[in-house]
Amino acid sequence: MEAGAWEPQTFEVFRRFLQPDRSYIDLGAWIGPTVLYGAALSRCVHAVEPDPVAFAELDRNVRANPGLCEKIHLHPFGIGPESGPLHLYAGGLYYAGHSEFGDSMSGMLAAPDVPGQPCHKARGVDMEHFLHMYARKDCNFIKMDIEGGEYAVIPGLWRRLWRWGPPTLCVSFHAPEIARRESLVRACIEELLLCYPRFYAAADTKAVALEKLADAVHDWGDDAPGSPWRKLEALLGAGLVATREEW
């Protein structure tokens, strides 16, 4: 997949923050578009993907790139709030009748009020343990696109990564249903404000006043175009870069 044809803002973030002598972690590696691109820019990449269908395709794609495969370490499990069993739901928060594993939408949070949503029991590892085991010396960047799982692994937990910097984080948020929207999004924002001094929009690389944008949302159910919530959603959905570095 050529850079520029798929989420070009992600590749721009990679070009800015990945370093040839540092490793990075790709959470939600899917079938590997960011993994292969990032491997060319970093010392090595730890690709984490708990969806068994996506992981099989990821493995094939990595093997098809012999010039990069030695720099790519594949992990067939997910990052969870704690180490142990992890339930992965086809379609995640946005399950529909056609959702299936491997379509990039699998997530730790199930869709509300959807009985019979397909579920896969995977292995989960907490972020602190993963860093200690696999990337404790040289990780400077984490990409996170885990279809709603951000609401489980960031709040109250990201602060534990202080001994690693914490690494710069590029996270794509996925809007939950209205009933949980404010509580989940605010919990993540508050944790990131505690951990990082600088925030940038992946879409245009501009600095953002994250706390101010969140405080401007008074009606979290207002989905009208241009509403404060929709502006925040657009920023978070396209990718938020949280870092201690200047862009």
Language-model-detected regions and their locations in the chain:
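Phosphate/nucleotide-binding beta-alpha loop and adjacent structural elements of enzyme active sites
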Residues: M1-W247
